[in-house]
């Protein structure tokens, strides 16, 4: 593979255009020249002093080859990134991390752990297909024809609009961003936002709103529906992988400066249902409201004795292999840990397990409810924990948390469990108090009353003052008992004995057992209830906040300045900030019934009150113009055509200039989706930019890694607010702000005398907050003269466009600057791995309750079917949004997965990892199925589905390719299930020929090898090309498709 790649890129003229990195002097005739530089520098012998072991050649940063954002140690020579390892200061990458006060000069010889993707990040940065200049389409959208244009011209065109494509024969007057930025007055925006909230709560009518705001109704999308918000909302920013820091920078632009609600991330393509189910299942009850919650509790792997894994490939993906592999392996090696894995595919961790149960995809709740039945029948639940109804009761019984297992639930006449009973409803307390049965009588419960220690009865089915009530555990018992254990086993595809054995083992380790789950369990239409059932298993043994149980992350020091004494409260440092308001294009965070669009059921499209960042709903909603039209969209680090199930169906929307008149991308390459836009502005890779990502879910101590530029930027420069800076997403947003006149950027952006002219003016303030700590007495040390000199020498290769030390110092006080240097010299701020525990408990606890019943879910409806959701775990078959059963013909059930060396799009450039280890993916079958199909390893097969009966993947207006892949036969997959991994089968990213300024840039065939499974996934027949989705958590379905396979 390496020789093939060298042969390709050694041709001097393979990329002639300077718009791409491979056509510049930096790479010369290609990447082998960099390799020669490596060899020239490192092949010395004798007394040669190894340059990569010198502290002045080391910079610390944060990875972005996957979501985990490992802390990294970047080794540089002559300005070139030569090697990437883990940062030994960080507990993310070294189990017993180095003392934070250890000098970087002493730390230089110690490396932390890093996965193959992280080490291959060099090729992400130095990809010859990287975009350096702004390009504009030179033909119809998706034609593959481009031309370079000056940065300032591109900014002028997207801001001012007009007939900007007349040179290619298009006669369309495009509204520029300045024409969409209509609501400009912060006072008007605030008043309107407040009143839309009143409309939402039914405290104000639309007529009253219109009368009050009669002088400004022209700024609204539709004055008859003020809750759609201002015309500003017709600007969409959709982003994929983005981390803290950059999140706040872009939200500052989209939400606070431009005033659009449409900042949409890609989370429902990832683990959103898991996140939201955990958040609601760990909330606190404060001042009469459920609030807070933790989105991603995980097992304390270092102390767990029994780990039950559902649909999570912990050695290959999740959050992430670097953090999970070591404690799990140590536990297996020492005999401390026993593992069971419930997954249709034999994952790496399943190969080490005591039991592997190849479940039927989508039937995780059936297996979990079988376990719950066995646990209740055999009384193996933690009675003491579940009975504790208040925090004081938990404290008195030496428990760090408590549950709502005993909080009575009202049962409607039709048998539907609704909201919790409140004490005022039966005359024993207030509307903010719950009711339990304690000592045979109803008792009012305020969960946080520090003087109240109450224990409730677990199984209750009674009437109080004429109101039918049941306890949450009673409702769960009834669901679990609705089928015999043998029936649950049959539904799940497991053996009854496996359910019994695993249930017994799970309840044999006290608090030191845990259920871990992720995408495999929740990326289904029934994903919410699957996830909730697995969460309840953890709650039944009361393992929350215990060593070896389910625990919170260690968190970090606040980067946004919301702690007392921190120098930069970023939310308050934005004069003339606009108040965003209105329904997002995805209808997320809103109940259909509270909007003025409510006209009974079904709604025109789904609404997602309990989810956010519903990526798969974005483009179908744009296509339908519901709830309104989008006039301009900016896409960054996101590839909807590649990452969305059925994304190819939405290609027609991207290509339609009537649907989205102005389509812009900020991208490092001409990608699988950015190839269809009007303008592409080059962006920086993670080795050239800033962020403050936050830590992995699996670390129990504070971690604040800081992403900072470690190599010179490889994009062209531009002048923004009088400063020469590299073209990037930040520069693009700042240039738009400068041209349109938005608040929050440029002169006095943070307040009088506090400018935001360069991205460092923003990001260094975040680092200063981290250095300050969360409370008094937590300041990091100030860098001494030796550390200051090291800082200067290690940054010596960076140009002033990204490292102007005088301007860096000017954006902070002298004292803040020295402490920021101390943090940057270590790549962030890190607590010792010894700081994770307090006795038998996790030190940083989940503050809320273990909630077995979610009344807010039970009190809400599916916007399409009109039926109520359920507040406790239940078994549901696979259904569309209208609750029609999906019972497709198709011989095989399709699932997907990741390899440890691959991540969606960006790792296709990694010749050292993905392409060297496995240049293409496979259609993975069990040998039983291969015999039926009469296929062998390497045979090509066509894969088809109900939603794609011809097996065609549309990649252009008039071009498609077949969904054909090579067979790989394994024993480690359930018969009847077929697996196709992601991160292959590209048609952008340098995989095909394109044309720039009349020159053909040849694609590299190896980048397009393999089969992409997403075009095969089942679509919702009622929603015009939208994938099946979970109506509560909002996740797109990746595991509910049946396919047929035919040898070709």
UniProtKB/Swiss-Prot annotation:
Signal peptide region: 1-39
Keyword Membrane set for record: no
SMART domains (UniProt xref): Molybdop_Fe4S4
GO MF annotation list: 4 iron, 4 sulfur cluster binding; metal ion binding; molybdopterin cofactor binding; oxidoreductase activity
Classification via InterPro entries: Asp_de-COase-like_dom_sf, MoPterin_dinucl-bd_dom, Mopterin_OxRdtase, Mopterin_OxRdtase_4Fe-4S_dom, Prok_Mopterin_Oxidored, TAT_signal, TAT_signal_bac_arc
SUPFAM superfamilies in the record: ADC-like, Formate dehydrogenase/DMSO reductase, domains 1-3
Domain 4Fe-4S Mo/W bis-MGD-type: 56-129
Gene3D superfamilies: 2.40.40.20, 3.30.200.210, 3.40.50.740, Dimethylsulfoxide Reductase, domain 2
Residues that hold [4Fe-4S] cluster according to the record: 63, 66, 70, 115
Keywords recorded for this protein, A-Z: 4Fe-4S, Iron, Iron-sulfur, Metal-binding, Molybdenum, Oxidoreductase, Secreted, Signal
Post-translational modification comment from the UniProt entry: Predicted to be exported by the Tat system. The position of the signal peptide cleavage has not been experimentally proven.
Cofactor(s) annotated in UniProt: [4Fe-4S] cluster; Mo-bis(molybdopterin guanine dinucleotide)
Catalytic activity field: selenite + a quinone + H2O = selenate + a quinol
Record bears the keyword Signal: yes
Gene disruption: observed consequences: Disruption of the gene abolishes selenate reduction but does not affect nitrate and arsenate reduction. Selenite reduction is decreased, but not significantly. The mutant cannot grow with selenate as a sole electron acceptor.
Residues reported to bind Mo-bis(molybdopterin guanine dinucleotide): 270
Enzyme class: oxidoreductase
Pfam families reported in the protein's UniProt record: Molybdop_Fe4S4, Molybdopterin, Molydop_binding
Annotated GO CC locations: extracellular region
Cofactor note: Binds 1 [4Fe-4S] cluster. Binds 1 molybdenum-bis(molybdopterin guanine dinucleotide) (Mo-bis-MGD) cofactor per subunit.
Function: Component of the respiratory selenate reductase complex, which catalyzes the reduction of selenate to selenite. SrdA is probably the catalytic subunit that reduces selenate.
Subunit structure as annotated in this protein's UniProt entry: The complex is composed of three subunits: SrdA, SrdB and SrdC.
Family: Belongs to the prokaryotic molybdopterin-containing oxidoreductase family.
Name of the protein this chain belongs to: Selenate reductase subunit A
Organism placement in taxonomy: Bacteria, Bacillati, Bacillota, Bacilli, Bacillales
